[in-house]
Amino acid sequence: MSNLLALVVGFVIVIGHLGILVNGLGVNWGTMATHKLPPKTVVQMLKDNNINKVKLFDADETTMGALAGSGLEVMVAIPNDQLKVMTSYDRAKDWVRKNVTRYNFDGGVNITFVAVGNEPFLKSYNGSFINLTFPALANIQNALNEAGLGNSVKATVPLNADVYDSPASNPVPSAGRFRPDIIGQMTQIVDFLGKNNAPITINIYPFLSLYGNDDFPLNYAFFDGAEPINDNGIDYTNVFDANFDTLVSSLKAVGHGDMPIIVGEVGWPTEGDKHANAGSAYRFYNGLLPRLGTNKGTPLRPTYIEVYLFGLLDEDAKSIAPGPFERHWGIFKFDGQPKFPIDLSGQGQSKFLIGAQNVPYLPNKWCTFNPEAKDLTKLAANIDYACTFSDCTALGYGSSCNTLDANGNASYAFNMFFQVKNQDESACYFQGLATITTQNISQGQCNFPIQIVASSASSFSCSSYSLVVLIVWFLLSGMMF
């Protein structure tokens, strides 16, 4: 009996250590980075943290190979720049054959969804994909059906929350409607999803309600005590619930009030704005996850919600056009190490996730401002050059390195460039303004990182990154080829 008791206690301890993930919780795995972790390392990290659902932004062959046999549920994706091609049914069938059917075997990849585009109706795209998205969606789902996969793999379109809104005269969730300029396309999409028993996918970002809007009530972006907004007797105490239910009302208005909804992206960045930091991210997730863990839902959908957190890792090669925070959505740093306590079980415990194992780093070398430099007239131009080719978003207002002095700013910029260039000695010259040191030059909360050894499987290679930023640099400098 004592042996049995010990076995039971040991089992309970193991289960307690591993944790039980919030039902239906997944993560977005983006790969827009100059130095990527090996895909197999990332897959193991997901498994170590009991994350069993992952949403991709493509169907990269190396990534898919790493996912094979893992048992993880996978949402593969067709990027926006391929939507026009997918309006051809033959091309759609070929894509399904190469990226879905190919992995449909025991020990293959457990593909459950195909994301057709990513936020294709964003206003910033100026309508580029409005008339391509529905034909692409229909062709992909029909190709899945023809391949005999339609019951287990569903096509969906991840949409930004700007596809719906409430009128300024009645800004409450119950008045939610799809945007007038895309109501026709949205009705087509929703009707088609309904016929194929597929969900609609929406990306909700409470952080963006705060960003650049000092009039937005800060607490309303979180889950812990905002002044409620009343909508016909329903109190909304946070923008996530209000946003989600605005979609529910929009769906109801076009005859699909019961359509399943996936939250394709939701998260909080940790750098690049005064509200983007680890403390705020902890507060946000510590409010969101316990709600999901109890299947609390929202006032109009008071049940289970399928959610994919955004994102898994920081991505230093993403565009910062939306804002400097765009490279810092990860719950893990670029090297797979956790940033802040987060309890994916929804139990509200203050514990760190398990980081990536056996990550290879470059040597302990930094590039710093040369205090003996004489000609400082070229300093500003060299800092601009370094930041064009690397990620200096931590230097921005409200960010972790915002308090550095002029020399510190130069050192940070030079070091980020040096690391992106794999610590090549020629990348720490800057017309005599920089020098290499083996002393860690981090200051306070401002970390001067050492880059990881880039995965040989990286599809977004440093050389391709350099080509892109070189073109940008020439354009910024007004130079001609």
Curated annotation (Swiss-Prot):
Keyword Disulfide bond: yes
Post-translational modification: Contains two additional disulfide bonds.
Glycan-modified residues: 99, 110, 126, 131, 409, 440
Statement: the UniProt record of this protein carries the keyword Secreted: yes
Keyword annotations of the record: Cell membrane, Cell wall, Cell wall biogenesis/degradation, Disulfide bond, Glycoprotein, Glycosidase, GPI-anchor, Hydrolase, Lipoprotein, Membrane, Plant defense, Secreted, Signal
Disulfide bond entries: 367-428
Annotated GO MF terms: glucan endo-1,3-beta-D-glucosidase activity
Top-level class of the enzyme under EC nomenclature: hydrolase
Signal peptide: 1-33
Lipid addition sites, GPI-anchor amidated serine: 455
Propeptide feature: residues: 456-481
GO CC terms of this entry: apoplast; nucleus; plasma membrane; plasmodesma; side of membrane
UniProt family annotation: Belongs to the glycosyl hydrolase 17 family.
The protein's name: Glucan endo-1,3-beta-glucosidase 8
